[in-house]
Amino acid sequence: MAGIGFELRKMLRRNTLTGLMQAYTYAGLIGAGPWVLSIVGILLIGVLSVPFVKPNGAVTQFQVSVTYLIAVSLVLTGPLQLWYTRFTSDRLFEKRRELVLPNFHAVMLVVTAASALIGALLALFAFGGQTAGYRLLMLAGFVVMSNIWIATIFLSGMKRYVAIIVVFFVGYAATALAALALKGFGLTGLLAGFVAGQTVLLCGLLGLIYRDFDSDRFISFEIFEKRYRYPSLMLIGFLYNLGIWIDKFMFWYSAGTGQPVIGPLRASIIYDIPVFLAYLAIIPGMAVFLLRIETDFVEYYDAFYDAVREGASLQHIERMQRAMVEALREGVWEILKIQGMAALILFAAAPTLLHWLGIPALYLPLLYIDVIAASMQVVFMGIINVFFYLDKRRIVLWLVGAFVVLNVVLTALTLASNPAAYGYGFALALFVVMLASLYWLDRKLDTLEYETFMLQ
């Protein structure tokens, strides 16, 4: 916990407004940086390329192609993300650091093989009408993106947040520059620039990993042994990523809202733009989440379990437990307040923002509900992260499973309704699971001492 938590606590100890603002800015950039850089990078490439790329629809084809690469690679690697993070954390706790890198190579090999096989089949049979260059670049991009998520989740688990944001900035700067340099080659040039930039990003992430870890063995498949498997974490990783994207796929492939773009890929103009903009509003909530979880909560969490392991007095254990619970409740309440304020500010600025971007005011109602949904997603993410600290995997599995089911059912109902209802399926699904997660968290915190001592 030393890395980011130590830096944030150092800023907060100054007890100045500047220190507080610096800590929030630092946490916001780290917490939401990769998301924001990804969104801004793709949008920037599109905006700057429009006047130069022919045919006119090539930029849209590029943005849609990249969106699918991101979405499908996230869902594909979801089962491995949390599983490998848990494996690595356990080996570091056991002081078996030499096992980390060989098993990372094994995971990368499996991800590369799976993404290459799936990508090759899709390139051959689903994109038969496209050029060989486009199909090869989509295949390469799919493999690279899949490996990026594994490397990113690994470094996140090791609390290398600052390094991640720096590498993502360099990677997306390289992506934008390469894509713009090759824009004269149309869609193929833009996609080649994207793949080149993402390769730079992946190399940067791998460089961070190799700098911190070494081993006498190159590869080891211990992670795939039965004793190290975590089926619940595999399902959670898959279902969470599926839940985030399933409503988008439903809008893309619905006859009334989706339009064909290139090959089998479709997009929903009415749904996609507000969603992209709404996710830019999560920065304040992510800042508060990271600041409060990695400082106050983690500090008391460590103190509580250290007291339990070291046999401290009951009074001290109870005091640490109360402090941990209070820090957590204050943190959740602060996330709700700050994210709510950010949503209200965006509501007020939305008409001007859409006008400045040249987007019709018709998108305003959907943007509003998407901002609310994104805000609830931040709260939901924060709570399930706490459940992971408490090792309540079964609860998280139920929550993300319910999220997927509710998102599918409610989005289907809104699609069958009228355009005024669009976006409410995703928002209502998040609202229900957010309330459920708050309820379960409150219950588990009340019984934390009992479960700590009696259920071991």
What is each stretch, according to the model?
Residues 167-211, 420-443:
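Hydrophobic alpha-helical transmembrane segments
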Residues 146-166, 368, 372-398:
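Membrane-interface junctions at transmembrane-helix termini in multi-pass inner-membrane proteins
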Residues 1-42, 60-64, 225-233, 445, ...:
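N-terminal membrane topogenesis motif
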Residues 92-104, 272-353:
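Specific pore-lining/lateral-gate transmembrane helices of multi-pass inner-membrane transport
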Residues 53-64, 94-103, 117-143, 355-364:
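Membrane-interface helix-capping segments at transmembrane helix termini in multi-pass transporters
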Residues 197-295:
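Transmembrane helical elements of multi-pass membrane transporters/channels
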Residues 63-89, 241, 245, 275-300:
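Small-residue-rich midsections of specific transmembrane alpha-helices
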Residues 125-138, 321-330, 341, 345-375:
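Interfacial segments at transmembrane-helix termini and the short loops linking adjacent helices
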